[in-house]
């Protein structure tokens, strides 16, 4: 198998609504050699990856995939690769991974192998190891071009993968918080490779670092980290704490020991996880040795009175005791046969034990502390303990040093509960681990004694979510409920705008409407990321990384995200779901790139945000491919947009109570109207929207309708929608490269980024309407600077020229700055040839390769009353060229409002007749168009 491409998707994508990895592979000879015809292959594979027995595949029960491997000729290697990658991730600890699919690509023997992942690095590594294993098990003649490693050690590689996965995985505490958030449908983002996690989006977000939250006070952490100060602060309010001294020298330690009296505890001033702690000391020699051990972790050392009793961790969250665990130091139990060292090995065989915090329990170690306790007990590592004898190889019950935990939450005495809550409140911690020593947690400390030895600002949750004995406690849920109280939002409203043409203008319109409504808008477009109207990052920012940048910004109250085809194909959507999503149109552009060759395939890509939107999808009812997307949507509402007031399906949809935005004709113009739940809301006359050039720019009329429909679905007030549309203009500063009009010395220039046939057609139609209506006062010749991106299909470049042919007096054909794989003059020459083929005289056409020179030449040719349309690639440079020729922007006459048309949807209008092969589907959202599976 040869890998042609590797790609990972971070959100909803063409294959699934969750993260997946895709390997594109060429099977070569394996295309004709499925699993069952390769001698010994299946047995060797199942022996190496026994987890495959659990895969049901098409049979839906364990063992189903093994049947597929053996039955008839078996199954193909791409399918096997998919299942092995899933099984290896499961073995590496990614237990939720179960999804996979293998689909043929365009070429014979080439397949897309797709499978789910939890952690991207682990998913990729599992894929690579799966390939190596399959190549190792297959005969060399079936793997031409693949270098075989004669020393390949699969189990060794698998162990490396497991260890690497454990290092990269979220720790037990952080992982439990993430799971609790997912259970509450709260989105989360991992902000680094460790334990920094963001819950929620934008202004609604909260963050955690392990179990420290964004609500945790810094001064409280400082106090809890200072053991001496903690002891003093708690003692000052009458809480039970041991007497304590801080020392820096051995002689000071001995003097403090005499004052306190034996037995004693010696511990570092500011260490954690039980490091350097020695308890139950009864001699000066033990104190000196313990002092020096503690000095390895802290310059200052604490001595305190020893409190007898069991070690308990009491977890307080938001001033409530949520869990208590009795911590038992790491120990072994003799059996009369094994040595202590062998008993330690036996304990470490427990699959719950791992290194550090990677699992719910930590491995035991025979280190210096264990040796001290062995010596104190008169034992060595080779001692055989009598059956039933318990020997502690740790003096503290920390889980990080091999201890175990017993849940005792339900038996805690009320006095002890109140004491723990007071301790956390005294220091000021929202999440606090109270280390409390007492002989019996079910009896009051006031009766039998006890004391608080420490407070922890970042307490571990392992002992509570997965105790060795007793009931697991949802302590992570308590933290998430504190950060996001009941009914508190965790998401900001998200709008996703996709389609072929009009995305950027619609995105900017919608963002402007929200800004007028008082929101702090985060916006992604093809020219950059904007936060509250200010450019934050420049460039094409329409992919998943850009979306996440906006959603991470804590100042943003609403996210308006332009969603382009490229980002969806490369990495997916980048977040779980938008509230509102729209598809403006599906038109010929980018075909022949990244495996997308037809408009129907392009529609599948554009449909991704539509499928996952939660509240409303807004679809172009005048585009059949957009119309068909509605049936795939799970959103609560479907809103259609149409320029045709007699659209039969939309009228039927409105009669059913569905949502729509329609263009209605009145006596003095055209009115944008909103229909929702039986209501008819006249919104705004099109000639009052500056971006439409008095209603002449129909593509911007449509963009305004989409912006209005989305804003209405997002709960924006009608007056704010009207105000936003009336104050949005297509100036260079509000919408660069989107129908920017400039008046220079008596002639007009229109600058646009149109780069496909549909966009060029829209602008040429606008020019026709403007000239016909004399809206810009132009009566001279028309000039067009024409170009097309080099990575488009030949037929698309030809079509671009064809739609412009015959509509201008002169043409200047240029290329974009980047030829995108074509010769320097190839695109301009193709445009010229296509113009001439469409009837344009050669004398009307000029070839100027450089965009900069082409624009200068066109500007020089313009005279009084002329109109120049420039399709530019480098928008900012071209705009500078234009403004250097003159000043003054086109002034538009004040529009005169007309009477409300008062158009209504007639009850007796004929029903919509679906096209052949399709059918009408009705549900609570209105009327939808779907494929008729039963049609011939």
Where are these regions (language model features)?
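Adenine nucleotide phosphate-binding catalytic loops in nucleotide-utilizing enzymes
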Residues: 596-603, 636-761
């Amino acid at each position: 198998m040869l890998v042609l491409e590797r790609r990972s998707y971070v959100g909803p994508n063409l294959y699934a609504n969750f993260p997946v990895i895709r390997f594109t592979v060429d099977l070569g000879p394996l295309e004709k050699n499925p699993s069952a015809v390769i001698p010994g292959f299946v047995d060797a594979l199942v022996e190496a990856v026994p987890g495959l027995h659990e895969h049901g595949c098409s049979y839906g029960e364990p063992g189903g995939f093994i049947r597929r491997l053996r039955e008839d000729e078996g199954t193909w290697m791409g399918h096997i690769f998919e299942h092995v990658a899933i099984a290896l991730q499961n073995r590496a600890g990614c237990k939720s991974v179960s999804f996979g699919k293998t689909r043929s690509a365009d070429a014979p023997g080439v397949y897309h192998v797709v499978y789910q992942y939890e952690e991207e690095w682990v998913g990729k590594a599992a894929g690579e190891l799966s390939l190596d294993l399959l190549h190792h098990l297959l005969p060399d003649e079936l793997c031409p071009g693949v270098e075989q490693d004669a020393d390949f050690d699969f189990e060794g590689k698998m162990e490396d993968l497991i260890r690497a996965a454990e290092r990269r995985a979220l720790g037990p505490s952080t992982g439990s918080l993430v799971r609790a958030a997912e259970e509450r449908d709260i989105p989360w983002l991992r902000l680094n490779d460790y334990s920094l996690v963001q819950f929620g989006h934008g202004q609604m977000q909260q963050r955690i670092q392990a179990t420290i939250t964004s609500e945790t006070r810094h001064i409280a952490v400082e106090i809890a980290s200072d053991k001496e100060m903690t002891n003093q602060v708690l003692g000052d309010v009458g809480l039970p704490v041991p007497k304590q001294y801080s020392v820096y020298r051995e002689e000071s330690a001995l003097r403090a020991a005499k004052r306190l009296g034996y037995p004693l505890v010696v511990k570092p001033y500011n260490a954690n996880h039980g490091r350097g702690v020695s308890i139950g000391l009864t001699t000066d020699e033990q104190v000196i040795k313990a002092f020096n051990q503690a000095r390895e972790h802290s310059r200052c050392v604490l001595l305190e009175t020893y409190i007898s009793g069991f070690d308990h961790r009491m977890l307080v969250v938001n001033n409530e005791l949520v869990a208590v665990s009795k911590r038992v130091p790491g120990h072994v139990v003799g059996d009369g046969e094994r040595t202590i060292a062998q008993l330690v090995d036996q304990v470490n065989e427990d699959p719950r034990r791992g290194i550090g915090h990677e699992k719910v329990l930590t491995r035991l170690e025979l280190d210096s502390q264990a040796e001290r306790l062995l010596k104190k007990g008169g034992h060595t590592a080779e001692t055989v303990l009598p059956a039933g004898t318990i020997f502690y190889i740790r003096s503290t019950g920390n889980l990080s040093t091999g201890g175990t935990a017993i849940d005792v939450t339900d038996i805690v005495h009320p006095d002890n509960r109140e004491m723990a809550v007071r301790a956390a409140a005294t220091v000021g911690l929202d999440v606090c681990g109270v280390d409390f020593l007492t002989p019996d947690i079910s009896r009051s400390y006031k009766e039998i004694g006890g004391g608080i030895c420490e407070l922890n600002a970042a307490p571990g949750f392992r002992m509570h979510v997965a105790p060795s004995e007793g009931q697991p406690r949802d302590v992570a849920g308590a933290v998430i409920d504190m950060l996001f109280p009941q009914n508190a939002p965790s998401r900001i409203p998200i709008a996703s705008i996709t389609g072929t043409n009009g995305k950027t203008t619609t995105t900017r319109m919608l963002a402007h409407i929200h800004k007028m409504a008082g929101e702090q808008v985060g916006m992604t477009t093809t020219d950059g990321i904007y936060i509250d109207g200010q450019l934050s990052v420049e460039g094409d920012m329409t992919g998943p990384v850009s979306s996440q940048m906006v959603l991470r910004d804590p100042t943003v109250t609403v996210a308006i995200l332009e969603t382009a085809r490229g980002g969806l194909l490369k990495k997916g959507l980048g977040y779980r779901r938008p509230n509102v999503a729209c598809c403006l149109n599906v038109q010929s552009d980018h075909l022949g790139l990244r495996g997308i060759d037809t408009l129907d395939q392009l529609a599948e890509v554009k449909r991704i945000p539509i499928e996952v939107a939660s509240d409303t999808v807004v679809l172009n009812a005048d585009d059949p491919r957009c119309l068909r997307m509605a049936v795939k949507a799970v959103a609560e509402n479907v809103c259609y947009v149409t320029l045709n007031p007699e659209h039969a399906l939309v009228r039927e949809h409105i009669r059913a109570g569905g949502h729509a935005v329609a263009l209605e004709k009145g006596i003095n113009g055209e009115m944008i109207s909103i229909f929702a739940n039986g209501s008819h809301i006249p919104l705004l006359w099109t000639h009052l929207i500056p971006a439409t050039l008095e209603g002449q720019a129909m593509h911007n009329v449509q963009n305004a309708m989409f912006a209005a429909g989305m804003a209405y679905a997002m709960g924006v007030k009608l007056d704010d929608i009207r105000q936003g549309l009336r104050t949005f203009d297509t100036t260079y500063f509000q919408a660069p490269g989107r129908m920017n009009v400039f008046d220079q010395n008596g002639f007009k220039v229109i600058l646009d980024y149109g780069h496909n046939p549909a966009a060029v057609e829209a602008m040429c139609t606008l020019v026709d309407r403007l000239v016909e209506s004399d809206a810009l006062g132009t009566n001279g010749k028309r000039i067009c600077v024409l170009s097309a991106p080099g990575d488009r299909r030949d037929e698309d470049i030809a079509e671009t020229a064809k739609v412009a042919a015959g509509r201008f007096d002169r043409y200047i054909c240029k290329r974009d700055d980047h030829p995108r794989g074509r010769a320097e003059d190839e695109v301009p020459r193709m445009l010229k040839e296509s113009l001439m083929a469409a009837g344009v005289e050669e004398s009307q056409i000029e070839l100027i390769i450089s965009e900069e020179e082409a624009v200068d030449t066109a500007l020089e040719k313009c005279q009084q009353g002329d109109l120049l349309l420039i399709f530019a690639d480098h928008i900012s440079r071209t705009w500078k060229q234009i403004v250097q020729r003159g000043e003054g922007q086109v002034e538009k006459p004040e529009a005169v409002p007309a009477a409300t048309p008062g158009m209504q949807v007639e009850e007796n209008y004929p029903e919509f007749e679906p096209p052949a092969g399709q059918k009408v589907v009705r549900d609570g959202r209105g009327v939808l168009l779907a494929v008729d599976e039963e049609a011939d």
